[in-house]
């Protein structure tokens, strides 16, 4: 089959046409991929950064954001039938650790990542356990279904705390950050402020519904807070940037008793003024992936109740033009990039 493969321990990803079709175990489902999306993780793997070198075995079929149709099911699978439109949870969990057995699979100690530690979805076919397959309702378009993985990250992070009537700060205007901003507005936050230094992505945040999108290299965040009538600080902070300076500023402008969810990963150790956390009585929560499968149910419910994410998909290419997709992702001048397998030449 055709697939995008991390074939060498160097910068790049390569199209190969002779990749073996994955085998289907008795509890597995084979999905014929129709559309894929490029994740920031895929860009890290493309760049072959320090994390990728330590994490990804080579060769590896990459990718974990997709939508497709069931092609084949294993002998013991009863919940799915060929032809059904589906996506899949990208974290394969063990099922036996304490957290898995308690229903907290997103906290599994032995998580294996699709397209990172096991063959992924930048391929004509991907095989995952039936437990990881999620059926997509007919009223959700393919382009949105293909980004359920990062949409799930945004949902898990944003809905970590009650947002109704709250003032929310989102640090980082990448695709997940701007989707989190849209979610916060959808569920009833008062002011949603997004910070970044990338004007393209700040404009995207505005189109996704942010009250204010602030370039902190040019504007004073506290002045913006005053303009909005905020007197005591933000009630909820969502750290999506992985930038130490952004996190430190977030802590400075949080209200006493505020709540902070962190999805962004810092590149290395960062100095933090922990007195901000202690004396303000802040709550911090780390977020990894999606709650299985409460996050998925909430994603569908929000889309079916009017949440509009269409603006976050900014570029579309045929899978044969994947290099253009990676180039625009690496430029920082994009939202989500979707690759169409049906448009292959």
UniProtKB/Swiss-Prot annotation:
One of its GO terms (molecular function) is zinc ion binding. One of its GO terms (biological process) is L-threonine catabolic process to glycine. Zn(2+) 1 binds at residues 39, 64-65. It is an enzyme of class 1 (oxidoreductase). Zn(2+) 2 binds at residues 94, 97, 100, 108. Coiled coil: none annotated. Keywords: Cytoplasm, Metal-binding, NAD, Oxidoreductase, Zinc. Its EC number is 1.1.1.103. The active site is at residues 41, 44. The record marks 149 as: Important for catalytic activity for the proton relay mechanism but does not participate directly in the coordination of zinc atom. One of its GO terms (cellular component) is cytoplasm. The keyword NAD applies. Homotetramer. Belongs to the zinc-containing alcohol dehydrogenase family. Catalyzes the NAD(+)-dependent oxidation of L-threonine to 2-amino-3-ketobutyrate. This is L-threonine 3-dehydrogenase. It comes from Anaeromyxobacter sp. (strain K).
């Amino acid at each position: 089959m055709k697939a995008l493969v991390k074939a060498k321990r160097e910068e790049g990803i390569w199209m190969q046409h002779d990749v073996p079709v994955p085998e289907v175990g008795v509890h597995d489902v084979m999905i014929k991929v129709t559309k894929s999306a490029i994740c920031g993780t895929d860009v890290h793997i493309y760049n072959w950064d320090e994390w990728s070198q330590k994490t990804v075995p080579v060769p590896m079929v990459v990718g974990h954001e997709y939508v497709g149709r069931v092609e084949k099911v294993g002998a013991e699978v009863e919940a799915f039938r060929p032809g059904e439109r589906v996506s899949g949870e990208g974290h394969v969990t063990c099922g036996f650790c304490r957290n898995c057995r308690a229903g907290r699979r997103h906290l599994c100690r032995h998580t294996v990542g699709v397209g990172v530690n096991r063959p992924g979805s930048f391929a004509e076919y991907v095989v995952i356990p039936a437990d990881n397959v999620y059926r997509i309702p007919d009223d959700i378009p393919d382009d949105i279904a293909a980004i359920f993985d990062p949409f799930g990250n945004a949902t898990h992070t944003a809905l970590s705390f009650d947002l109704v009537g709250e003032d929310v700060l989102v640090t980082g205007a990448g695709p997940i950050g701007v989707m989190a901003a849209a979610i916060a507005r959808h569920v009833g936050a008062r002011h949603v402020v997004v910070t970044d230094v990338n004007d393209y992505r700040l404009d995207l945040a505005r189109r996704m519904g942010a009250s204010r999108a602030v370039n902190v290299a040019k504007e004073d965040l506290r002045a913006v807070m005053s303009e909005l009538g905020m007197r005591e600080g933000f009630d909820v902070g969502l750290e999506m940037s992985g930038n130490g300076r952004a996190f430190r500023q977030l802590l400075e402008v949080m209200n006493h008793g505020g709540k902070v969810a962190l999805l962004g990963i810092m590149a290395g150790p960062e100095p933090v003024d922990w007195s901000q956390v202690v004396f303000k009585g802040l709550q911090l929560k780390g977020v990894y992936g999606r709650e299985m499968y409460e996050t998925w149910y909430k994603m569908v419910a929000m889309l079916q109740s009017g949440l509009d994410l269409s603006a976050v998909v900014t570029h579309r290419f045929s899978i044969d033009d994947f290099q253009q997709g990676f180039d625009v992702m690496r430029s920082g001048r994009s939202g989500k990039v979707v690759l169409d397998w049906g448009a292959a030449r």
